[in-house]
């Protein structure tokens, strides 16, 4: 089903692009299913025809048959008419290599026929140079689509790719209405994602290039931006520095490779590659097991409700929640109401289990009022920053890390409601749709940022956002991700912004290693250093690269929006090519460090494990409604998962405080504690925390005497509804 209920649901123009994107995603998915079913049904005919053709062609290979007799011999095996029928059948059934089930997409024309006029007549599209052809087609359809014409022979044809041509232009050379419409929508979807076509006046779907530093603003800030990013104004100086780093690192790694037992050079395949042995799990010494057990035994049991109130007593995070329209509005016991609302959202249980009619701070009216007026992205972010900053002051957290290192990973949530802010992925969501909560965790175990992503979009689009948009006191400069977050463009952007990108690549040894000096001799690494970078691209775009990086650093443009616009599906711009070029060099520096330094690989793995373990705590907290997110709109999803991050941070902070107290207690008891053991402790435990509430087995005296409970008043019933 299309993930929207009708045009009446839309609150404005910004809703159209995501609806279009979601609709086409469903159409493409269904087209693939239909095409695969068709192929299965025709497989026997295709196999039979292929075998017949193979037999016919085998006569061509018989040396003993004279050339002039081949046709007669073939036709003696398969009559001419039969062979012609087989060839026709194969051409009908077999799919070309560039086929993307477009024929099945055209069959679903009826699903877009009613939607398209609303889109074309309501949204004002504009374009960058790369989107002019799409915009021309859009203007044409906005004029002609209301007509009943079956053929659009005067339509702009530049958008018709080779894979679409046979479905758009029929045998009589007419441009069909159905084929052209679906071809256009496919092109429009791609152009909107890349922002080659954009929505005029929209923040989310507008032109990111227009928001970059430019003109007098750029000239006034140019030198300041160069200095803040730590790059020279002369591109040759930057290239010389990169070349020296890369050359010296190649030589250092090559000199030590024969001593590196974890890495082998494999030349048996078509291309040489490195084989990297997996890291062995770290042994857990008896002293660490004993320390973990002693601390676990000392941690007092606590209800999650009390934990939130206790953390508020330490940090005052509830003070960050202020009334949406009356900043000075405060009521008695507001922290209690806020804690209840936070728990309702984070645990995914709703307000009902927390309502107490005899407690003023927990009445139905108070909790609904608190949720409506105090819970929003702004206040959640500020409250979370208080917890993260408090965690950073604790001695135990400082042993774990200094806050300079972080990891990014996604948690998947099924969304069993109709919403445009969700996407399909059978691996994670089965037959449902879902969202990804892409969150960032510091080496002190605190979560400092989170992004809600429809479905499972490429992580690489969002990985920089957590560093640039987070509002805590931490200053992470290095980030670890899984393979999905890695791309050469991201490596380039990280370097331009002064950050270190350290992903865990699934097959690092098979990656392309790039060199800057074509003639350099890197010994045993010569065979894998087969990529040749082109520094000229960097020189030509150097000032533009710094302008782009400076705009990101100053928050002029959102990272994910810009990355989408840079990732052209066809013919990347000169700027994109230059960033990718510098990314290749920095990716190679990373790869050389990765294969050479086991401690580096271990550090990446350790930080990623922290993020995954933190997800387990968040799952335990978000236990209601099968852990499914049932908010329909983006704001609601972001607020709920932001609340989950806040409550998870409260659990981590509470555990850290009490673990520190337990360590102090053990020292006072004369225990000798090993610093290395303390560094390997984790605050990501939750067995001592009651998140499920308490159950009462007492009855009111009236009921024990056989009387019924009083019925609700009408006003109460309306409030519940």
Label every model-predicted segment.
Residues 310, 314, 318-320, 330, ...:
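Active-site cores of enzymes that catalyze phosphoryl transfer or operate on phosphate-rich substrates
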């Amino acid at each position: 089903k299309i993930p929207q209920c009708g045009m009446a649901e839309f609150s404005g123009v910004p809703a159209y692009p995501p609806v279009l994107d979601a609709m086409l995603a469903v159409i493409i998915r269904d087209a693939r299913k239909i095409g695969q079913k068709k192929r299965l049904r025709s497989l026997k005919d295709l196999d039979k025809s292929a075998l017949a053709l193979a037999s016919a062609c085998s006569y061509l290979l018989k040396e003993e048959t004279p050339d002039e007799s081949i046709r007669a011999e073939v036709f003696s095996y398969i009559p001419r008419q039969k062979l012609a029928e087989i060839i026709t059948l194969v051409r009908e059934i077999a799919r070309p290599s560039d086929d993307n089930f477009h024929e099945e997409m055209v069959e679903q024309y009826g699903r877009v026929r009613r939607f398209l006029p609303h889109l074309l007549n309501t949204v004002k599209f504009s374009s960058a140079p790369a989107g002019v052809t799409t915009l021309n087609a859009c203007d044409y359809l906005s004029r002609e689509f209301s007509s009943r014409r079956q053929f659009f022979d005067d339509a702009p044809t530049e958008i018709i790719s080779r894979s679409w041509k046979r479905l758009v232009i029929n045998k009589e050379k007419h441009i069909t209405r159905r084929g052209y419409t679906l071809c256009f929508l496919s092109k429009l979807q791609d152009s909107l994602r890349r922002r080659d076509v954009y929505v005029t006046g929209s923040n989310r779907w507008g032109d990111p290039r227009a928001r970059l530093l430019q003109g007098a603003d750029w000239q006034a800030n140019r030198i300041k931006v160069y200095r803040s990013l730590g790059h020279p104004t002369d591109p040759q100086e930057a290239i010389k520095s990169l070349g020296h780093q890369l050359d010296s690192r190649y030589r250092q790694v090559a000199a030590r490779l024969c001593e590196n037992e974890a890495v082998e050079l494999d030349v048996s395949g078509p291309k040489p590659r490195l084989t990297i042995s997996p890291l062995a799990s770290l042994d857990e010494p008896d002293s660490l097991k004993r320390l973990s057990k002693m601390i676990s035994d000392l941690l007092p049991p606590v209800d999650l409700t009390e934990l939130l109130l206790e953390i508020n007593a330490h940090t005052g995070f509830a003070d960050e929640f202020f009334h949406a329209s009356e900043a000075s509005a405060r009521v008695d016991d507001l922290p209690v109401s806020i804690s209840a609302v936070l728990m309702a959202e984070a645990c995914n249980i709703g307000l009902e289990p927390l309502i107490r009619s005899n407690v003023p701070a927990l009445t139905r009216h108070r909790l609904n009022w608190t949720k409506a007026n105090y819970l929003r992205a702004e206040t959640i972010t500020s409250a979370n920053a208080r917890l993260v900053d408090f965690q950073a002051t604790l001695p135990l957290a400082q042993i774990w890390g200094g806050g300079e290192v972080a990891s990014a990973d996604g948690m998947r949530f099924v969304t069993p409601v109709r919403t445009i802010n969700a996407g399909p992925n059978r691996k994670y969501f089965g037959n449902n749709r879902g969202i990804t909560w892409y969150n960032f965790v510091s080496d002190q175990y605190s979560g400092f940022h989170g992004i809600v992503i429809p479905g499972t979009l490429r992580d690489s689009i969002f990985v920089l956002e957590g560093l640039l948009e987070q509002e805590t006191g931490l200053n992470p400069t290095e980030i670890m991700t899984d393979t999905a977050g890695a791309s050469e463009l991201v490596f380039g952007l990280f370097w331009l912004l002064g950050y270190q990108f350290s992903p865990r690549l699934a097959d690092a040894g098979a990656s392309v290693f790039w060199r800057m000096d074509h003639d350099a001799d890197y010994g045993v690494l010569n065979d894998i250093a087969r990529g040749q970078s082109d520094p000229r691209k960097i020189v030509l775009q150097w000032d533009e690269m710094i302008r782009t990086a400076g705009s990101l650093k100053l928050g002029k443009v959102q990272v994910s929006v810009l990355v989408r616009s840079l990732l052209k599906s066809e013919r990347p711009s000169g700027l994109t090519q230059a960033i990718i070029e510098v990314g290749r060099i920095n990716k190679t520096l990373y790869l050389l460090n990765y294969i050479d330094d086991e401690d580096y690989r271990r550090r990446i793995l350790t930080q990623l494990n922290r993020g995954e373990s933190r997800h387990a705590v968040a799952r335990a907290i978000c236990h209601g409604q099968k852990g499914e997110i049932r908010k329909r709109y983006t704001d609601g999803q972001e607020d709920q998962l932001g609340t989950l991050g806040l409550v998870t941070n409260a659990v981590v902070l509470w555990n850290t405080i009490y673990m520190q107290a337990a360590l102090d207690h053990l020292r006072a008891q004369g225990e000798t504690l090993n610093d290395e053991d303390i560094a390997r402790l984790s605050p990501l435990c939750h067995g001592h925390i009651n998140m499920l509430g308490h159950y009462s087995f007492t009855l009111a005296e009236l009921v024990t005497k056989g009387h019924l409970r009083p019925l609700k008043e009408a006003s109460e019933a309306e409030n519940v509804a």
